[in-house]
């Protein structure tokens, strides 16, 4: 996994991969779209959205 732009279904798939059974809290208000789609995010940043 390298830092990359993740948008739409790619972002959701990446969250499933990173969070696994923990699941994740997804809401556009949390800024994940700005952080990972508009900008580039890392695996570490994605983990912040796991439950």
Curated annotation (Swiss-Prot):
Gene3D superfamilies reported for this sequence: Insulin-like (1.10.100.10)
GO BP, sorted A to Z: cellular response to oxygen-containing compound; glucose homeostasis; glucose metabolic process; positive regulation of protein secretion
Originating species: Balaenoptera physalus (Fin whale)
Name of the coding gene: INS
SMART domains in UniProt: IlGF (SM00078)
Subunit organization: Heterodimer of a B chain and an A chain linked by two disulfide bonds.
Function in brief: Insulin decreases blood glucose concentration. It increases cell permeability to monosaccharides, amino acids and fatty acids. It accelerates glycolysis, the pentose phosphate cycle, and glycogen synthesis in liver.
Disulfide bonds: 7-37, 19-50, 36-41
Lineage: Eukaryota, Metazoa, Chordata, Craniata, Vertebrata
Compartments where found: Secreted
PROSITE patterns tied to this protein: INSULIN
Keyword set, alphabetical order: Carbohydrate metabolism, Disulfide bond, Glucose metabolism, Hormone, Secreted
InterPro entries linked: Insulin (IPR004825), Insulin-like (IPR016179), Insulin-like_sf (IPR036438), Insulin_CS (IPR022353), Insulin_family (IPR022352)
GO molecular function terms noted in the UniProt entry: hormone activity
GO cellular component: extracellular space
Protein name (database record): Insulin
Main location: secreted
Annotated family: Belongs to the insulin family.
């Amino acid at each position: 996994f390298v830092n990359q732009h993740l948008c739409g279904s790619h972002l959701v798939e990446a969250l499933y991969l990173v969070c696994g059974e923990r699941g994740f809290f997804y809401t556009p208000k949390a800024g994940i779209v700005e952080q990972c789609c508009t900008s580039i995010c890392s695996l570490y940043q994605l983990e912040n959205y796991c439950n």
